[in-house]
Structures are given as structure tokens and as C-alpha cells.
Swiss-Prot record:
One of its GO terms (biological process) is DNA replication. PROSITE patterns: NUDIX, NUDIX_BOX. It comes from Haemophilus influenzae (strain ATCC 51907 / DSM 11121 / KW20 / Rd). The lineage of its organism: Bacteria, Pseudomonadati, Pseudomonadota, Gammaproteobacteria, Pasteurellales. The gene is mutT. A motif (Nudix box) lies at residues 40-61. Mg(2+) binds at residues 39, 59. It catalyses: 8-oxo-dGTP + H2O = 8-oxo-dGMP + diphosphate + H(+); 8-oxo-GTP + H2O = 8-oxo-GMP + diphosphate + H(+). InterPro entries: Mutator_MutT (IPR003561), MutT-like (IPR047127), Nudix_hydrolase (IPR020476), NUDIX_hydrolase-like_dom_sf (IPR015797), NUDIX_hydrolase_CS (IPR020084), NUDIX_hydrolase_dom (IPR000086). This is 8-oxo-dGTP diphosphatase. Residues 4-130 form the Nudix hydrolase domain.
Amino acid sequence: MDKKIIQVAAGIIRNEFGQIYLTQRLEGQDFAQSLEFPGGKVDAGETPEQALKRELEEEIGIVALNAELYERFQFEYPTKIISFFFYLVNEWIGEPFGREGQEGFWVEQHALDAGQFPPANAKLIHRLLNETHNFI
């Protein structure tokens, strides 16, 4: 049986201080209580960037003004394959908050811990931790 491929677009919401906005997955979801980058499934007829902008508004109440593709990869789970599109978002309108009841908070980029995220995020976390940025 072929595994279903699901496209997911998520945002790396990074402020001028080098902090990244994360949310915590709700009870009842896969990987409940894990941290995640805000985003969600790409709907039929949408591009990943369109899905990202829609999901950011729905989930955390911001309007992304820019979105640069940062990382794209697939991760295979026992029953499905997730095709991830991670976008770096440095400009937005609004203050992010958990519109769907999830906790949200800012974390220093250098303090990201892959163990707090679903396994699919390990590669992305590794790349973010290896970056060097000058946030002024």
C-alpha cells in the first residue's frame, strides 16, 4: 500500500532579536505537547506559500509580509510521508498568539532543542543551530 503524501508549510517566525516564535502542540494531536513551528497542511489548489500565509493568520493571528523558502524535505512516518516547506518570516503585521488555544512563546534560536520537537524537525533544528547571525 502506498503511503499518503501530505504537504505541510510552516513558518520560522524570527524577530529582530534572533528569537523564534514556537507553539506547543495540543493534547489529542500527534506528538502532543511537543514544540512546533506554526503552520499546517497545504490545501488543494494552494501553493505552499499561500498555505503558510493562511495558516499563520489562522493559528497565530499574524499577516506575513515576506516568506523566503528556507528548507524543504520529506519525512517518512509509518503510515504517511510529510513533505515539509519551511519558510523564514522576518516581517509581519500583528503580535503572534495562540488563536487555537495552543501556548506560544519566543525562544532564542541558539536555545532550540530538537528533543522538544517531533522527530521530523531534527534536520531543521540542526541547521538553525549551526547558523551564525548578526542580529542588530
